[in-house]
């Protein structure tokens, strides 16, 4: 999600970013962000996206995950993307700009879906990180909880949910909540995640089964 971008004055981050293997690979492959390779690795292991599926991507900008999802669902599928930041159009992707914590963008997304059952909800949302864990962790968990609430509204039985989480307070309870609603919950830490990052991804499969 765009809100997590670092300040331009972070020289170290800029140097690391431009020399980063996954950034370079994304540029070569035509992906908008290194995050595309996180989803591709999870896809390789878990085969969560298939042709013809309906996918919702929360925290989508700049669109790396949308590119991967649109390629995999093909012409018979559909991808719906939401982010607080503007995002350039992508073929096969319906883009909505807005803050997911507010009601109006959520309603716009639900209206765009037109009641169609969703096969997969993706969430790469993260707050602006202050570097103060006691501040950042509750904000991150709040976004993960909102994404789960949304998934519970739109997923069809047997649907899947993939969300970014950060290790810290509230994560164990959140995982237990997933286990109550889904038949299987798996933790993934893609190689394209930065080594020093506390982020990982929870893949919850089999909604309501």
UniProtKB/Swiss-Prot annotation:
Cited SUPFAM superfamilies: S-adenosyl-L-methionine-dependent methyltransferases
A Pfam short name: FtsJ
Record flagged with keyword Transmembrane helix: no
GO molecular function: rRNA (uridine-2'-O-)-methyltransferase activity
EC code(s) of this entry: 2.1.1.166
Catalytic function, reaction form: uridine(2552) in 23S rRNA + S-adenosyl-L-methionine = 2'-O-methyluridine(2552) in 23S rRNA + S-adenosyl-L-homocysteine + H(+)
Annotated localization: Cytoplasm
Transmembrane annotation, as ranges: none
Keywords (A to Z) from UniProt: Cytoplasm, Methyltransferase, rRNA processing, S-adenosyl-L-methionine, Transferase
Highest taxon of the lineage: Bacteria
Active-site feature positions: 164
A GO term from the CC aspect: cytoplasm
Residues where S-adenosyl-L-methionine binds: 63, 65, 83, 99, 124
Main location group: cytoplasm
Family annotation (PANTHER family): RIBOSOMAL RNA METHYLTRANSFERASE (PTHR10920), RRNA METHYLTRANSFERASE 2, MITOCHONDRIAL (PTHR10920:SF18)
UniProt cross-references to HAMAP family, sorted A to Z: RNA_methyltr_E
Role: Specifically methylates the uridine in position 2552 of 23S rRNA at the 2'-O position of the ribose in the fully assembled 50S ribosomal subunit.
Protein name as it appears in the record: Ribosomal RNA large subunit methyltransferase E
Gene name, Swiss-Prot/TrEMBL: rlmE
């Amino acid at each position: 999600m765009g809100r997590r971008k670092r300040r331009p004055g972070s020289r170290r981050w800029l140097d690391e970013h431009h020399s980063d293997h996954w950034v370079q690979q994304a540029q070569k492959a035509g992906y908008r962000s290194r995050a595309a390779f996180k989803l591709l690795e999870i896809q390789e292991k878990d085969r969560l996206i298939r042709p013809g599926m309906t996918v919702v991507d929360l925290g989508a900008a700049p669109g790396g995950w949308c590119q991967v999802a649109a390629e995999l669902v093909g012409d018979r599928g559909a991808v719906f993307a939401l982010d607080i930041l503007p995002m350039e159009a992508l073929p096969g992707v319906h883009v909505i700009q807005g803050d997911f914590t507010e009601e109006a963008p959520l309603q716009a997304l639900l209206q765009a879906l037109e009641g169609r059952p969703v096969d997969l909800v993706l969430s790469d949302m993260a707050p602006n990180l202050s570097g103060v864990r006691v501040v950042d962790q509750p904000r991150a968990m709040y976004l993960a909880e909102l994404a789960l609430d949304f998934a519970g509204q739109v997923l069809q039985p047997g649907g899947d949910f993939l969300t970014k989480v950060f290790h810290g307070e509230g994560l164990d309870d959140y995982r237990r909540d997933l286990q109550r609603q889904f038949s299987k919950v798996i933790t993934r830490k893609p190689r394209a995640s930065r080594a020093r990052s506390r982020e990982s991804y929870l893949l919850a499969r089999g909604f309501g089964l």
